[in-house]
A protein has these predicted regions:
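Alpha-helical transmembrane segments of multi-pass membrane proteins predominantly involved
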Residues: 1-246
Length: 246
């Protein structure tokens, strides 16, 4: 019973705190630009509004258009549950869980790109092609980072890998993971998720035809992914040890 409660608590932490990080980022960006900016809790308001709205479907859309965001959200949530939360450890930990984490992130990306192509829109197909092109580089970088941590710690378990020091290569590891964080979360300089400029859109263009709950799943999944990479970056560079239980 305690394990179930612990799992539910960790799940609630990830799901409830994830939309807060994009709000903080947008607030800081607005402050730097000299603007007031949206409220920190704006994404919570948007998600609540989208869950109450209906879904507008293209006549060319298949069931994969609806299933894609749902499967991607489940995959990202599962990946988050594998990620240790500081010294408290992770909800699901086993030997080789880091490999499952990489596969779940790839599955989420595949489902998002698949759903984009199911609309029959050349515009979203272009975005899916751009996403896959960047994924080739990002996945190679994250695999290299995982391999370096595995060699350094002698383990392929996330809890062990992130509870020990990264050694002399911590700076290079941090630079690599930070680059992956930017590429995976619409934060590269020419991919602004707040704009709709055709020449620069990568991630945002894939979800232009989504609405209602599927769009809410996409936005919430993106916030979970951003928080996951932020936690991974911090713990890879600043290991916090491990406690037996919460």
């Amino acid at each position: 019973m305690n394990l179930i409660l612990e799992f539910i608590l960790r799940l609630a932490v990830w799901l409830l705190l994830a939309p807060l990080l994009p709000g903080i980022i947008n607030k800081v960006k607005a402050w730097v630009a000299g603007r007031k900016g949206p409220p920190v809790l704006q994404l919570y308001y948007d998600l609540a509004k989208l869950w109450r709205k209906g879904v507008v479907l293209s006549t060319l859309a298949s069931p994969a258009f609806i299933a894609g965001p749902a499967v991607a959200w489940v995959a990202l949530t599962g990946a988050a549950m594998l990620m240790p939360l500081g010294p408290a450890g992770s909800a699901l930990s086993f030997r080789g869980d880091v490999l499952l984490l990489i596969y779940l992130l790839a599955l989420a990306r595949f489902c998002t790109a698949w759903a984009a192509m199911e609309t029959g829109s050349a515009f979203e197909g272009m975005g899916a092609a751009r996403e896959v092109s960047y994924a080739v580089l990002a996945e190679a970088a994250i695999v290299a980072a995982v391999l370096s941590l595995s060699v350094q710690t002698g383990s392929i378990s996330l809890v062990t890998m992130l509870s020990l020091s990264a050694g002399a290569g911590a700076v290079l590891l941090a630079a690599g993971l930070f680059t992956v964080l930017l590429a995976e979360n619409c934060r590269v300089p020419f991919d602004d998720p707040n704009t709709h400029l055709e020449l620069t859109m990568i991630h945002e263009v894939m979800v232009l035809d989504h609405s209602g709950p599927p769009l809410a799943a996409v936005l919430h999944g993106a916030s979970v992914k951003l928080l996951l990479f932020a936690v991974l970056l911090v713990q890879a560079v600043l290991p916090m040890g491990e406690l037996s239980t919460l």
